[in-house]
Amino acid sequence: MNRVLCAPAAGAVRALRLIGWASRSLHPLPGSRDRAHPAAEEEDDPDRPIEFSSSKANPHRWSVGHTMGKGHQRPWWKVLPLSCFLVALIIWCYLREESEADQWLRQVWGEVPEPSDRSEEPETPAAYRART
């Protein structure tokens, strides 16, 4: 043949190309591979980008056990100093006495100290009932 296709054959070739193009989507289904390009052809082309969906870094395939190992635990000498520091900081914040900086911040923010018992204020209805 002269490499010239007749009209029906050319239409069939175009249809096959269209089917191949349509089967390759931007977001392939998990676990499916692009059958139009064999794996050997993908490895031969170094300029082609790596497909995340088919890589081992895909979240459907990756887990923490792959990175750290299944029985991995942080050593106590890395965890203990940080834990002790955070506990000491929280205790210090709770137990420290009020300083001048705290008073200054109250003035800046406009906070008014709350009275210990609201029923003794003259504006509350409970205070009016107690007087009558």
Curated annotation (Swiss-Prot):
Compartments (UniProt record): Mitochondrion inner membrane
A cellular component term, taken from the record's GO annotations: mitochondrial inner membrane
Mitochondrial intermembrane topological segments: 96-132
Signal peptide: 1-15
GO biological process: one example: mitochondrial respiratory chain complex III assembly
Keywords, in A-Z order: Electron transport, Membrane, Mitochondrion, Mitochondrion inner membrane, Respiratory chain, Signal, Transmembrane, Transmembrane helix, Transport
Domain of life: Eukaryota
UniProt topology in membrane: Single-pass membrane protein
Keyword Transport among UniProt keywords: yes
Mitochondrial matrix side: 16-78
Residues covered by region (Disordered): 29-72, 110-132
TM spans (from-to): 79-95
Assembly and binders: Forms a complex, named COMB/coordinator of mitochondrial CYTB biogenesis, composed of UQCC1, UQCC2, UQCC4, UQCC5 and UQCC6; stabilizes nascent cytochrome b/MT-CYB and promotes its membrane insertion. Forms a complex, named COMA, composed of UQCC1, UQCC2 and UQCC4; activates MT-CYB translation. Forms a complex, named COMC, composed of UQCC1, UQCC2; UQCC3 and UQCC4; mediates MT-CYB hemylation and association with the first nuclear-encoded complex III subunit UQCRQ. Complexes COMA and COMB are bound to the mitochondrion inner membrane by UQCC4.
Function: Required for the assembly and stability of the mitochondrial ubiquinol-cytochrome c reductase complex (complex III (CIII) or cytochrome b-c1 complex), a multisubunit transmembrane complex that is part of the mitochondrial electron transport chain (ETC) which drives oxidative phosphorylation.
Entry similarity comment: Belongs to the UQCC4 family.
Name by which UniProt lists this protein: Ubiquinol-cytochrome c reductase complex assembly factor 4
Organism: Homo sapiens (Human)
Gene: UQCC4
